[in-house]
């Protein structure tokens, strides 16, 4: 049964928001089981890698769109007698946004390639990295775009505020950044400790 519908970050991402569901006395007929009893988490884990690639590509696209809007706004907006694009700090924010998007894009492509070549389990370090990098990068870029737009950047007149909140949500979806970073750090300590012992 649906306990309640909730919105996340004051936005409705699906009709009625995100539902809190209570499963009580639920039985699945044996013929409807996939893989077998008790293996649902295994199925979910197998889908997380491709799902994370998908979300990261969306984050990159949202950051790219925000960068384009920010650059156009900086080119046309005049404040205190100067175009925003003539301000060094604005140009630096645009440059940083561009290279941060490109870095996240390349890391995401590398993760997808690793998943294709060696499988999700062996590519887990790249998957964990992009899960943290892409939404954080998109949130940073969209924040810069909101700054360039001023109050308009917080409104529905541009998509950047929505992109900001979606990427904040993604930093918690499928586990908080901190959990992924902790696991990635543990993996790398183990990996480098073994390679140092061997060489």
Regions found by a protein language model. Name each.
Residues 7, 32-48, 73-87, 147-162:
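Conserved catalytic-core motifs characterized by acidic clusters
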Residues 42, 88-95, 121-124, 128, ...:
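Alpha-helical membrane and juxtamembrane elements of multi-pass inner-membrane transport
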Residues 121, 128-199:
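Alpha-helix capping/hinge segments and adjacent helical runs
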Residues 71-85, 101-133, 146-153:
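C-terminal helix-coil-helix/basic helical segment that borders enzyme active sites and/or dimer interfaces
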Residues 60, 64-67, 94-108, 131-142, ...:
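Alpha-helical transition-metal enzyme core signature, strongest for iron centers
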Residues 44, 111, 164-167:
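Short alpha-helical scaffolding segments that buttress acidic/His motifs in well-ordered protein cores
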Residues 1-68, 72, 177-199:
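FAD-binding core of flavoproteins
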């Amino acid at each position: 049964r649906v306990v309640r519908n909730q919105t996340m970050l004051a936005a409705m991402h699906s009709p009625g928001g995100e539902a809190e569901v209570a499963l009580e006395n639920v039985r699945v007929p044996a013929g409807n089981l996939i893989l077998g009893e008790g293996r649902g988490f295994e199925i979910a884990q197998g889908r997380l890698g491709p799902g994370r690639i998908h979300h990261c590509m969306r984050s990159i696209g949202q950051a790219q769109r925000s960068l384009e809007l920010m650059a156009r706004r900086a080119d046309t907006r005049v404040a205190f007698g100067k175009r925003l694009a003539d301000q060094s700090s604005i140009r630096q924010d645009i440059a940083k946004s561009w290279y941060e998007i490109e870095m996240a894009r390349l890391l995401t492509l590398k993760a997808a390639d690793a998943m294709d070549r060696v499988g999700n389990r062996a590519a887990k370090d790249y998957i964990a990295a992009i899960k943290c990098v892409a939404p954080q990068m998109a949130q940073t870029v969209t924040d810069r775009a909101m700054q360039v737009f001023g109050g308009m950047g917080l409104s529905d007149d541009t998509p950047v505020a929505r992109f900001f909140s979606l990427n904040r949500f993604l930093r918690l979806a499928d586990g908080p950044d901190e959990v992924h970073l902790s696991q990635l750090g543990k993996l790398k300590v183990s990996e480098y400790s073994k390679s140092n012992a061997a060489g």
